[in-house]
Amino acid sequence: MNRIVDDQITLIPYYRNDDISLLWYQDSEVCKQVDNTDQIYNLTKLHKMYDYLTSHGSCYYIQYEGVLVGDVTLQDNSELSIVISKQYQNLQIGRRCVSEMIQLAKEQKMVKVSAQ
């Protein structure tokens, strides 16, 4: 079920969409932000990551003004992760999505949320 963040942002439950999501993870600067490595993702690594995230939490695509621009996950262990493609960073998209994920954590009776 979609989660409406505001009039610009909707969180859409994860589904395989390699054509778009692989592009985010083939940007070495984004990978540095996410994993602290310059290693970009290949399709196998992307699938392993999403398979893990979807089986251990709530994973969503971030749709901004009708365009998929990243993903955000709240894991069962209360860890939050977020990726936003470079051209959509610094628009406060992440801040708004994190607020929505904190709300989701409250709904799931999580006491705290952490991010690395």
Predicted regions located by residue number:
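Acetyl-CoA-dependent GNAT
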Residues: 36-87
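Short, solvent-exposed beta-strand edge segments and adjacent coil->beta transition regions
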Residues: 6, 77-79, 110-112
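Short, well-ordered coil/turn elements that cap or connect secondary structure elements
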Residues: 6, 54-55, 107-108
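Conserved GNAT acetyl-CoA-binding A-motif
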Residues: 105-116
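Conserved acetyl-CoA-binding loop-helix of GNAT-fold acetyltransferases
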Residues: 90-105
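Short aromatic/hydrophobic contact patches that present stacked aromatics
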Residues: 10, 79-83, 114-116
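Residue-level preference for hydrophobic side chains embedded in well-ordered alpha helices
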Residues: 21-22, 80, 97
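A short, well-structured alpha-helix characteristic of acyl/acetyltransferase catalytic modules
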Residues: 1-51
